[in-house]
Amino acid sequence: MYDRILVAVDHSEMSDRAVRAARDLAVLSGGEVWVLHLREREMGAKTGVLRIDETTQEASDQVAASVNVLTEAGVKAHGEVRNTIFGYAAREIVNDAIEVDADVIVMGSRGRGDIAGLLLGSTAHKVIHLSDRPVLVVR
């Protein structure tokens, strides 16, 4: 059913839930999981310098922790950290899903950057509209 699952992660509780949902889908279907973490960057107006709120090590550590959750359950997992420009995360997630030929995209309903009161985070909302693949949004 789901041979290839892409799960988008950040440092949020919803992200942890998404990893667990991807794990459960993979265990049920015998699929493998790709864990994608995007580091959003902004261009500085004066200097053109990139500003990123987390270190490469922090991002890599989170991906490694997510991959560990999956492999402990017997799921084959791959992890990747990519940089993207602020506001382009949804496109990157969809493009990565195409690249790995994912059968489904799994992600949290809100990430750490979304306003807590929103029912559906802006990135999840955009992914749903941009993707031609099923999207499982975890709450």
Residue ranges, per PLM feature:
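Small/aliphatic-rich secondary-structure junction motif
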Residues: D3-V49, V75
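Short, hinge-like loop/turn segments at secondary-structure boundaries
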Residues: R51-E54, D96-I98, T123-A124
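Glycine-rich, Arg-bearing micro-motifs that act as flexible, cationic patches
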Residues: V104-K126
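Short, flexible loop segments at boundaries between secondary-structure elements
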Residues: V135-V138
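Structural beta-alpha unit
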Residues: T71-I105
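Acidic, proline/glycine-rich short linear motifs
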Residues: H37-Q62, E92
